[in-house]
UniProtKB/Swiss-Prot annotation:
The keyword tRNA-binding applies. GO terms for biological process: translation. One of its GO terms (cellular component) is ribosome. Gene3D superfamilies: 3.30.1440.10. The keyword Cell membrane does not apply. It comes from Chlorobium phaeobacteroides (strain DSM 266 / SMG 266 / 2430). Part of the 50S ribosomal subunit; part of the 5S rRNA/L5/L18/L25 subcomplex. Contacts the 5S rRNA and the P site tRNA. Forms a bridge to the 30S subunit in the 70S ribosome. Keywords: Ribonucleoprotein, Ribosomal protein, RNA-binding, rRNA-binding, tRNA-binding. This is Large ribosomal subunit protein uL5.
Length: 195
């Protein structure tokens, strides 16, 4: 058996939600949408998490803490996002650091989704379900989170400022209905649809 140099036996272990997708979600989706081939079943391609820190223009330390927190939540180093153009009303210059972003794929993506659905979302105050209208028409879903302290990785005593984030779930689904069923089957707690 040949193994890649950097690959450890722990990396071969599949994420819990990834095996759940293959064993449970794929058959449900094939039956519901009458796909002729397993490869036609939509899948989660990536999760993109973005934190916008507009106040970073005046106080750069806020961006550093946001990057540190995003790194703790995702287990991956965030990318700094810079402004594209100057806007005088916001005291913003071109190429000024105003946010950070992380894109998760494969195993880390499934592990994050598992933690998000089972640990973080239940900790949201007055939670009644995620909005089921935040689909973009192309099978992608974006959830806005108001507080980063819902994640267990964040120590509430060390948080200088509460900030929110946008979490985008990019799927290979052709329609919003397929994406809704896919994410709901993966455990996403949506509000009940009004028919």
């Amino acid at each position: 058996m040949t193994r890649k140099k950097d690959e450890t036996p722990a990396e071969k272990v599949e994420a819990r939600l990834e095996s759940f997708y293959r064993e449970k979600v794929v058959p449900v989706m094939m039956e519901r949408f009458q796909y002729s081939n397993v490869m036609m079943v939509p899948k989660l391609e990536k999760i993109s998490i973005n934190i916008g820190v507009g106040e970073a223009a005046a106080e750069p330390k806020l961006l550093e803490t946001a990057m540190l927190e995003l790194g703790q939540i995702t287990g991956q180093k965030p990318q700094v996002r810079k402004s594209r153009k100057a806007i005088s009303n916001f005291k913003l210059r071109e190429n000024q650091a105003i946010g950070c972003r992380v894109t998760l794929r494969r195993k880390k993506m499934y592990e994050f989704l598992d933690r998000f659905v089972s640990l973080a979302v239940p900790r949201i105050r007055d939670f009644r379900g995620l909005s089921n209208t935040s689909f973009d028409g192309r099978g992608n879903y974006t959830a806005g989170i108001r507080e980063q302290i819902i994640f267990p990785e964040i120590d509430i005593d060390k948080v200088p400022r509460i900030c929110g984030m946008d979490i985008s779930f990019v799927t290979s689904a052709a329609t919003d209905e397929e994406a809704y069923v896919l994410l709901a089957e993966l455990g996403m707690p949506f509000k009940k649809k009004n028919n």
